[in-house]
C-alpha cells in the first residue's frame, strides 16, 4: 500500500451509523446488471461487501445522494452490487477492494474519483453527466445553480481565446468535484463579484458560504489555478471529519497545517481564532486543518503525526507532494512564524526515532532504528538487506517467516546482514519509504541502495542477496580461507 495513500486511508476511515437503505438506490445482481446499465445513460455503481466498515460508513451518504437526485428529477441513477454475492461481476470489473465505485456513461465504465460526502457525490455525477462548462445567461440562472450545487466555479473572459480562458477550460475538463460555468454577460459576472476578467468560486455551505475571486493576471497555469480552487473550495480552516477528509487531501494542494486540539479545551476559542487568522493569510499556499483530539477515530492520525494526545494543543505541517514529510515548530514559533519558516524551506523535518532495543542484535534478523541505521546499513564491509515494515501491514505480517528463514541462512556469514526497521516508529531523512513492505539492499562498498521488487519468497531473496554478496556457503568459505591465511 502506498504510504501517501495509506495516510489518506487513515483520514477517511470511520464507522458510519446504521440507517435504512434508500429505495432510490438500485440493487443490481448478475441477472439485472446489463439491463440496468444499458437501459440508463448515467449510472453510478457501488461494489461493496456487507462486512466492510468503509462501505457501512459510505452507505447513508450514498443513499442521501440518490434521494437528492431523485427529488431533482435527475436522469442519473445510483446503484449498488454486493460483490460477495455477485463475484462474477466483481471479477469482470476488477474489484480489488471495498467500496469500489464505477461510473457508467452510455454503458462505458470509468473510476469514481469524488469524495464520500453527499454533496460531493451529487456534484461529481452531475459534472460527469453534463457539459464540461455551462454558459450562465442570467443572474436568476446563477442563483438557481447556487441553490442546487455546493461549489460553482464561474469564469468571465471577454476574449474566449485568451491564455487565461484556455487554462480555465483545461482545468474545468480535469476537475470533477465542482460545477464549471462561464458568465454570459458582465451583469452575471458582477453578481459573482467579478468586475473584471477572472474566476469566481462560489461555495454554498450555510453560514460558512463564501465567494472568492482570482484575477485573470493571476491565472498563469493549470497547476496554480487548481491549487487556488482546492484552497477556496474549503473553509479557511476545515475540520477533519469523515465527510471532509477526501476533499482535504484529494485536491492539488498537498501541504497541510494541522492544529491538533480538543474542542472541549477552555483555550479552544482563542486558539482557533488565531489559527484562522493565519490561515486566511496563507489560503492558497497551504491547507489549514483542525483535528479534534476528542474524536476517537482520530487516534491513528495522531500516531501518524507523532503527537501524544496528552501534549496538545499542538501543530504540525505535513507535505504529501512527492513523499510524506512532517514538520513541527521550533520552540517559540507561533502559527504564522512556523508557516513562513516551512514555506521558505527553513523548517527541518520532524523524524520519528525509536529507542535502540538492548537485544537488537540477539536474533538472526537484526533490529534497526534511526540511531543505528547508518552504522549497520551503510557499513561498507557488509552487504545489508533491510525490510522496512509497518506492524499493521498484512503483507508485512505474511513476510515475517520468510524473512526469518532468510536471516537464518546467512546467520553464519559475517559479510551479510538481514535486518528490519519499523518505518512507523523510525523515519530517515535520506531513505524514502513509499510502500509497505519496502525492501532495500546496500551492497558492500556502496552507500547507494538497490530496491528489491521481485517475488517475495526465499529462493528469489537468496538469488538477490547472492547477486551482490555471493552465496552464503561461498562467503563463509572465503571468510574461513581469509582467516587461515
Curated annotation (Swiss-Prot):
The record marks 456 as: Lowers pKa of C-terminal Cys of second active site. InterPro entries: PDI_thioredoxin-like_dom (IPR005788), Prot_disulphide_isomerase (IPR005792), Thioredoxin-like_sf (IPR036249), Thioredoxin_CS (IPR017937), Thioredoxin_domain (IPR013766). The lineage of its organism: Eukaryota, Metazoa, Ecdysozoa, Nematoda, Chromadorea. It catalyses: Catalyzes the rearrangement of -S-S- bonds in proteins. One of its GO terms (biological process) is protein folding. Keywords: Disulfide bond, Endoplasmic reticulum, Isomerase, Redox-active center, Repeat, Signal. GO terms for cellular component: endoplasmic reticulum; endoplasmic reticulum lumen. Residues 21-130, 342-470 form the Thioredoxin domain. This is Protein disulfide-isomerase 1.
Amino acid at each position: 500500500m502506498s504510504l501517501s495513500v495509506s495516510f489518506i486511508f487513515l483520514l477517511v476511515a470511520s464507522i458510519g451509523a446504521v440507517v435504512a437503505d434508500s429505495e432510490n438506490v438500485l440493487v443490481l445482481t448478475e441477472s439485472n446488471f446489463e439491463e440496468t446499465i444499458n437501459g440508463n445513460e448515467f449510472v453510478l455503481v457501488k461494489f461493496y461487501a456487507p462486512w466492510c466498515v468503509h462501505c457501512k460508513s459510505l452507505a447513508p451518504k450514498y443513499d442521501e445522494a440518490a434521494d437528492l437526485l431523485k427529488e431533482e428529477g435527475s436522469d442519473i441513477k445510483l446503484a449498488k452490487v454486493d460483490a460477495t454475492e455477485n463475484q462474477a461481476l466483481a471479477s469482470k470489473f476488477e474489484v480489488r477492494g471495498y467500496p469500489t465505485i464505477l461510473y457508467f456513461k452510455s454503458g462505458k465504465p470509468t473510476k469514481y474519483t469524488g469524495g464520500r460526502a453527499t454533496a460531493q457525490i451529487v456534484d461529481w455525477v452531475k459534472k460527469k453527466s453534463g457539459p464540461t462548462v455551462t454558459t450562465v445567461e442570467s443572474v436568476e440562472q446563477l442563483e438557481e445553480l447556487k441553490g442546487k450545487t455546493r461549489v460553482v466555479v464561474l469564469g468571465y473572459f471577454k476574449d474566449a481565446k485568451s491564455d487565461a480562458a484556455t487554462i480555465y477550460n483545461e482545468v474545468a475538463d480535469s476537475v470533477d468535484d465542482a460545477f464549471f460555468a462561464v458568465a454570459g454577460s458582465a451583469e452575471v459576472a458582477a453578481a459573482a463579484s467579478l468586475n473584471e476578467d477572472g474566476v469566481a468560486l462560489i461555495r454554498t455551505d450555510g453560514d460558512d458560504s463564501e465567494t472568492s475571486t482570482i484575477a485573470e493576471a493571476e491565472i498563469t497555469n493549470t497547476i496554480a489555478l487548481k491549487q487556488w480552487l482546492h484552497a477556496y473550495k474549503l473553509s479557511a480552516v476545515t475540520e477533519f471529519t469523515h465527510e471532509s477528509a477526501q476533499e482535504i487531501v484529494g485536491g492539488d494542494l498537498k501541504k497541510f497545517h494541522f492544529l491538533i486540539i480538543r474542542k472541549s479545551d477552555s483555550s479552544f476559542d482563542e486558539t482557533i481564532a488565531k489559527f484562522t487568522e493565519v490561515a486566511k493569510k496563507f489560503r492558497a499556499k497551504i491547507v489549514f486543518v483542525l483535528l479534534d483530539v476528542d474524536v476517537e477515530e482520530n487516534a491513528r492520525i495522531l500516531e501518524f503525526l507523532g503527537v501524544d494526545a496528552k501534549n496538545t494543543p499542538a501543530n504540525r505541517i505535513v507535505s504529501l507532494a512527492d513523499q510524506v514529510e512532517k514538520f513541527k515548530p521550533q520552540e517559540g514559533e507561533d502559527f504564522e512564524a512556523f508557516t513562513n519558516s516551512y514555506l521558505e524551506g527553513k523548517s527541518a523535518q520532524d523524524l520519528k526515532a525509536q529507542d535502540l532495543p538492548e537485544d537488537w542484535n540477539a536474533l538472526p534478523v537484526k533490529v534497526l532504528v534511526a540511531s543505528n541505521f547508518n552504522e549497520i546499513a551503510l557499513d561498507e564491509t557488509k552487504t545489508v538487506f533491510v525490510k522496512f515494515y509497518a506492524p499493521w501491514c498484512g503483507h508485512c505480517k505474511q513476510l515475517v517467516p520468510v524473512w526469518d528463514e532468510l536471516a537464518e541462512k546467512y546467520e553464519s556469514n559475517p559479510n551479510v546482514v538481514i535486518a528490519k526497521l519499523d518505518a512507523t516508529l523510525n523515519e530517515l531523512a535520506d531513505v524514502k519509504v513509499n510502500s509497505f513492505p519496502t525492501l532495500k539492499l546496500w551492497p558492500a562498498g556502496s552507500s547507494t541502495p538497490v530496491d528489491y521488487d521481485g517475488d517475495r519468497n526465499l529462493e528469489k531473496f537468496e538469488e538477490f542477496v547472492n547477486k551482490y554478496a555471493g552465496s552464503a556457503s561461498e562467503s563463509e568459505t572465503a571468510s574461513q580461507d581469509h582467516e587461515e591465511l
